[in-house]
Amino acid sequence: MQCSRSENAELFALAMGGYGLFGIIVELDVEMTPNQLLEPKFERMPPERFADRFVRTIDTDHAVTMAYGRMSVSRKKFFDDALMVTYRPAANQPAPLPAVTSSGKLTGLLDDIYRAQTGWEAAKGLRWLIESRIGPTITGGRATRNSLMAEPVINLAQTDMRRTDILHEYFVAPERFGEFVVACRDIIPKSRAEFLNVTLRYVAEDKTPALSIAPVHRIAAVMSFSQEATPEGEIDMMQTTEALIERVTAIGGAFYLPYRLHARRDQVEKAYPAVASFVAAKRHYDPDLLFRNAMWDAYFA
């Protein structure tokens, strides 16, 4: 079956962000972005200023083709400092462009320090020092778009079988980002889990998906934790997740659903007001529940 915004539009909206509950997408037409050699610009600022600066730069500087943010993660200086990185096309574009490589001279060192952050607060401070001050000073940072997008997952692999990694992703309106930062400061440092990284990105308004993460433009915070692979570690993470979701939904935000079934059902319904119509459509198109998963059983059944 062919689906698009103009053909079988309802199913398209349900399948895009439908978590596999409305079928299997076997072929996809997507628009490609040309590969370019890019030059970075690094700007440090208080986290409270980040959202306004980030959105204003993206909205007004049309030369910016990629942008992201980071924040400090040590417990003593948690979310006390922010870094905005923007990329613009280099003036001279070589032909052909360089082959895809790792993302810079310090990538290997930063990967080692990334995993060393578990149980070692000094490594968190060292990583932030390299990423926010030393790296921008001693490396040119020029890279192709493809290289920036091709960071191997193996670089972040967890090798300690006593622990497991978990991602959280939250979406908040830029004008509420300061409140989100306060919520994270209140909750995350008290957790038993190790907080390893946060990457901030801009998400444009997208009202197409039935369960949209961005019915208005938002800032996404992708957060990486390392937790103990024990019942106590799992309970602690569940409590941390519920507390964060409570604060995020209180400011009109949402969270990405399928990382772990730690959210309460009422929290899912608050973050996604269209849940009832989503479930009704599921029962209409798939009454026998041919496509079913644990998330359906936990939140929608």
Short names for language-model regions:
Residues 1-301:
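Noncatalytic alpha-helical scaffold of FAD-dependent oxidoreductases
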